[in-house]
Each structure stands twice: as structure tokens, then as C-alpha cells.
Amino acid sequence: VGMGAVEAALRDKPVIITEYGAPCAKIMIVGEGPGRDEDMEGRPFVGRAGQLLDRMFAAIGLSRSSDDADASIYITNVVPWRPPQNRDPSPIEIDMMLPFLRRHIALAKPEIIVAMGNISCQALLRKRGVTKLRGQWATGCGVDVMPMFHPAYLLRNPLAKREAWQDLQAVQERIR
């Protein structure tokens, strides 16, 4: 995908949301793309799903507001804009933004990436099906990746929170 395609895709996007948290963090969280709340605030994961994400990582002693590399998380998305009608990013959009995501990862140098949902699994692992992938360590962009259910999914399917807790505990074990 050439730069002309990137420029065309970004031309009509009013808000570009890149990252939040301490770039020195050992853990990078990669979401799918901004939603309505993120579009309004200009930061990733600020709506109900973001509040759940904060509670999830607080349960293992991590926070997006900490400057301590050992206690912080760094958050970004596969695509930095809200797709029209809040749809999932298309395969073309994912492929278009993949070089930027890879470079972002290379610059941040996380020890672990948490891939939140199908779109981030597709981008990082080139696989879909977070239900099958979750709970198993994989490698993406040269970094250990833990696929997890997206917090928005957990809000719709509270019974999956038990599996998400197991995944968080695996992340906690890996960083100790």
C-alpha cells in the first residue's frame, strides 16, 4: 500500500488517535480502533470499554497513568481513526496501517503486547479468531503477544471475564 492510499484514507478523518501512557512501559496494549468516546476525547480506550480495561490492568498492579516502566501500560490501536458507522477496520485499512504499527512497536520496545480482540490479532499475528487464540502466547513483530478478548466484548459477554482474568494472570506472570 503506497503513501497515496494512506493520505487518501486519512484525508477525511477529523481526529487521529495514536497512543496513551508511558512509552517506556513493558506492556503495550493494541486495540482495534477508536470508538465514539475516543473520537471525542482524543485518547484510546476512554469509554466504558476503556474503564473496564483500566480496572482489569489495575487488578494486576498496572496503570496507564504511571510513569514507572514496571507499573505502566502503553496503549495504541491498529488504526488511529474511527471507521465510519463504527464498523471494524477493513483488511485494506489494517494492511495500510501495519507498517506504522510495526514501527510504533519497534520504537516503544515493549516486552509484551496484549492484542485486544480480533482486529489486533489479525494485524499482529495475521490470524483471526480471538476465542481460539486467547490464553496462548504467540509472537508478533518480534514480541511476545497475549491475545485477549476486547473489553467491549467482555461488557457484552460477562461470562468471558473469567477467561480474561486467566489471560491477565498469564501476563502478570510473564512480567515478573
Q: What are these language model-derived features?
A:
Residues V1-R176:
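A polyanion-binding, active-site-adjacent surface
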